[in-house]
Amino acid sequence: MDSQQYNSNINLILNDEHHTETLNVDKKILIEKCEYFSRMLTQFSEINADTITIKVVDSNIAKNVIMSMFSDIDIYKNIGNCCDWKYLLLLYKCCDFFNISFDITKLNKLLVPNEGFELLLDIIDIIGYNYDMIELIINNLPKNYDLGKFPRELLETLYDHSTSYNIVSGSLDRTIKIWNVETQDFNSKIFTKLSKTLRYFPINKEQIFDNNIKCMDYSHKFNQIISGSNGGIKLWNIDNREVIKEFQCDYKINDICFSPDGKSCVCANKFLSIYDLDNGRRKVLNLTRIKSIGCIKTCVCWTSDNIIACGDSDGVIEFWNAETNLIIKWCQVSKSRISNISFSPDRSQIAVSNQTKIILYDSIFDKKILEIKNSYIINFAYSPTEDVLVLIDGYLIKLYNCRTGNLFRTFNLYDCSSQNTMYFSLQSKIHFSPTGNQIIFTCDTKNENLVGIWNWKLNDDIIYLKGHQKQITSLCIIPDSENSTNKRIMNMLKNQ
């Protein structure tokens, strides 16, 4: 292109289904400021054109976007040809079409009427289904929308990231309580006493068991909780609070975890035991490493359909193939007991902790990424929405960037001015809420055993849930199955 062509003006005719706008603009500025026009006017047949016709989603908005290259125009300010929500969505489409940057955070709190939901889905499909976009779908989902239009994977994600959730806590007082976060109360009690025969009890009745609750896990596949105690495993239906099945065992259960498909579970004790939850058959993974005799399995997680990771009391991490009963690999990561093991939500990291440090590895456990050292680590958890790791260190709650290892927030639970001082015990647990803005943890005072809820984003006062008579030993977060949207999603998942 010669200098005269490069510096000449060009006519742009912007057409939508109902309207046409015409612009006469500087070709040089278009090329310099917009990749779309740079490619069009230097590489394609339009290189020598004086007039170009472009089909756009909205000619007025497209004109505004193009003119922002030539003057200081706030493109996010509605120019008045449609309502605010529609303007913002069409603006994104125009910016995406012309490959012009758009501030995605402008969409985060957007509310659209039912008739705008399909347009919203079109925009989200372009952006991608990240956490903010999932929350946008949840907040705008029409009451009678046909959920059958969504693929199963999206339905599961919507259910797991519901903003309406319950907290489930198990205790040495032999109870499991399901707490409703909005009412700050528990809506039912499940008193657990191991019995040889399964009996049905109404929700307002108590059923007494022999053994303390040691550990729990939740499966969204069937909306079930599994609990382990010193002598028994129970499978619970969340919807009606009934015991579905129970399995007796003659060993102490240190940790329990559902398989990804929800059809089996793995228990950690001296060995790994896998239970088929349909028929109750138990398979023991009991091959031993050299020098592993006498070690116990302290924590466990299911990494994929067939692979199980567990931590041992001698500081070793093992990976087992659940089908072949063989150890795939093992690694000495510490000289002391492994207390926790967890995958990041995006499955790119696996974190392992002992008393004084958390070590982050890549997902296949071949490369150590970083170490986070502390004084007395009790428990940790990944955020479901950000690159954030939260941990309990002594009396402190600490927040780290899990990619860099940088500490960016600390909260001290200990209040020396209070006569009823709170503290973390060795059994304390910590989790994020599904939205990632709240941290849920267990703690104790001299006379009380508590569940705390802290909105660390807003730095609100902590809400404490009281009800357990003895120390809380397990904690999990579940979608609120009474929420109407959650009910519809769960019913759709069950019927697919």
UniProtKB/Swiss-Prot annotation:
InterPro entries: WD40/YVTN_repeat-like_dom_sf, WD40_repeat_CS, WD40_repeat_dom_sf, WD40_rpt, WD_LIS1/nudF_dynein_reg. Signal peptide: none annotated. The keyword Repeat applies. Residues 8-78 form the BTB domain. It comes from the Viruses. WD repeats lie at residues 149-189, 208-248, 250-285, 291-330, 333-371, 422-464. Coiled coil: none annotated. Keywords: Repeat, WD repeat. Belongs to the mimivirus BTB/WD family. This is Putative BTB/POZ domain and WD-repeat protein R61.
